[in-house]
Regions:
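Membrane-proximal helix-turn-helix segments that form the acceptor-binding/catalytic region
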Residues: 78, 82-84, 95-117
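Helix-loop-beta element that forms the nucleotide-linked donor phosphate-binding surface
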Residues: 110-111, 116, 123-143
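Nucleotide-sugar-dependent
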Residues: 1-4, 175-182, 227-232, 239-257, ...
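N-terminal subdomain of nucleotide-sugar transferases
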Residues: 1-29, 48, 187-199
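A charged, aromatic-enriched C-terminal amphipathic alpha-helix characteristic of glycosyltransferases
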Residues: 289, 293, 302-339
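Conserved active-site histidine-acidic residue motif and adjacent donor-binding/catalytic loop
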Residues: 206-210, 218-234, 289
Length: 344
């Protein structure tokens, strides 16, 4: 769901009165998307016309440099992950992939006015690698304030009946994060078989390589547009969150999405933003790689009562994209530093 952030944050900043250009090579000419919001190709960009340039993850900064904008005086770099010079516990990028990310990160530290990260663990690693003089802020993932209501049950079209455990999100590719991809495919297979014994179907959706998934244990539906996604979640009974290992620096964006509809969650303990489940009382946190414990928790949550409206209101107020965009207002309006003290 990381790609959604790119557009949702831009939309939210525009709603807050900022003039925003999304720079992508999808169209030959600029496109007006909404009030104060355009999408333009790189050929139309004049970097010197912008007060601030905000990049999206390592690849966004690489694109900025490649397109001649790396010397802009006010770059805000958003990082989804922070890697170490050496392999670091909790960071699940390895070998040449990690080395390339670190090279980009070093350039970000040298050229960016502000860097934003997702979690406390990522902030600590950034300071360890790049020093405490970096202007660093924590801006977690957000979620849509407005979503479609429930439509027809899409699972029935596929002949899937009964309780659904949903795993929504990227399971990664072999060329970027092979270790997590293979680990998660194995664990989804094991979890699917265990859930099946309890009368629950495990359904997964999102990008990533799925060649090791057992279709008898896990039904993988591929990727969907954000507008299509919500019906699948509305008609699920529990959401699944896997950790990437016994330690994990990255948050899980799917937690924000599950909670937006009050979907109860079974989450593994190493996931940093598991505290949202505790705050909302909507789910269970289980030890890492305890498949039977996950299945037992899912079976209990399928029929658990919860205050869906209260949970949704909480997520909108505290964790919507507009709430996240508001954190940038002091900087973008020249009023001073961004608020500090965020925690996940």
């Amino acid at each position: 769901m990381a790609g959604i952030r790119f557009f949702r944050m831009a939309e939210a900043l525009a709603r807050r009165g900022h003039e925003v250009d999304i720079v992508l090579n999808r169209h030959q000419e600029p496109q007006r998307l909404a009030t104060r919001l355009r999408e333009i190709p790189f050929k139309s960009v004049r970097w010197e016309h912008y007060h601030v340039v905000k990049t999206f993850f390592h690849r966004g900064f690489d694109s900025l440099v490649a397109e001649g904008g790396g010397d802009h005086p006010f770059i805000i770099s958003k990082l989804g992950s922070v890697v170490g010079r050496e392999q670091t516990e909790g960071v699940h990028f390895h070998g040449s992939v990690r080395e390339q990310l670190y090279a980009t990160q070093t350039a970000i530290a040298q050229r960016s006015r502000i860097v934003t990260v997702l979690t406390n663990r990522s902030a600590a690693l950034w300071w360890k690698e790049h020093g405490v003089d970096s202007v660093l802020f924590q801006v977690p993932t957000g979620v849509d304030a407005e979503i479609p209501g429930a439509g027809a049950n899409p699972y029935l079209r596929l002949g899937i009946e009964g309780p659904i455990a949903l795993f929504a999100g990227n399971i990664y590719s072999r060329d970027k994060q092979a270790e997590v991809n293979l680990l998660w495919q194995d664990r989804l297979n094991r979890l699917g078989r265990s859930l099946k014994q309890r009368g629950i179907s495990l359904v997964a959706m999102g990008a990533g390589e799925t060649d090791q998934l057992d279709p008898a244990a896990v039904r993988h539906l591929g990727s969907f547009d954000a507008s299509e996604y919500w019906d699948w979640q509305h008609h699920s009974q529990v959401g699944i969150v896997l950790a990437q290992g016994t330690a994990q620096d990255n948050e899980s964006s799917k937690i924000y999405y599950y909670l937006r509809t009050g979907l109860p969650i079974v989450c593994e303990e190493p996931v940093p933003n598991k505290s949202l489940i505790e705050e909302t009382g909507c789910g269970a946190i289980v030890p890492y790689d305890q498949i039977e414990a996950m299945s037992d928790a899912a079976a209990e949550l399928v029929s658990a009562r919860r205050d869906v409206d209260h949970i949704a209101d909480y997520m909108i107020k505290k964790h919507s994209w507009d709430a996240r965009a508001a954190l940038y207002d002091p900087v973008l309006r020249g009023e001073g530093p961004m608020p500090a003290g965020l925690s996940t």
